[in-house]
C-alpha cells in the first residue's frame, strides 16, 4: 500500500478507486461508505435496490464487459472516483491506469449462505455444493491476491466485512488513508449497518 510516486501520478492521472471482492462480501456497503465520505462514485443505478441489497448494488454496466474485451475508455472517467468491480474481473483491468483497491473479505461460509438466499429469492437453482463452492472461492481469492501483489499499478487494502461492523470508524479510517485522507470518516462509519449482517454462521 505504498504511495504512488509523483512522476507516475503526473503521467497517469489520479488513481481509480476500485471496490472489489466476491459477490455478497460487502462491496456495496464499502461503496456506500465511500459515497457517504464524499468520494464521487461511478454507477448507473440500473440495478435497483431490493430485499437482498436494500441499499442498492452500486453497479456500472460497462464493468461487466471487461472479460469480453469491451471498451475500457470509461476508466478515464473513473479516475478519482469509486467503481465496484468483482474479484473475477480484476485481472482484465488495463495496467495503463493506477488503482487503489478496497478488497472486501468475508467468511466464505457466510458468502455462500448469502448467495444461496439470494438465489432462493429469485427462484434460481444453486450451483455446486456449499463446501465445493467455498473451496473454489478460496482458490480464486489466493490467485487474485497473488495477481494484485505482482502488479505495481495496484495499491490494495484488505478489509474484513465483520471488522467493519465491529469497528466501523476504525475500518473507515483505514479506507480513508488508502484513498488520500480527505473523506469524512464519521459519515462513512454511520452508514455501515450491523442490521444487514444477516448471514453469520452462528445463526445458520
Regions found by a protein language model. Give the residues of each.
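Detector for methionine-enriched segments
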Residues: 1, 29-33, 104, 118, ...
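Short, surface-exposed acidic
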Residues: 42-46, 180-191
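A general structural motif at alpha-helix termini
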Residues: 115, 190-195
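PAPS-dependent sulfotransferase catalytic domain
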Residues: 80-184
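PAPS-dependent sulfotransferase catalytic core
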Residues: 1-79, 193-204
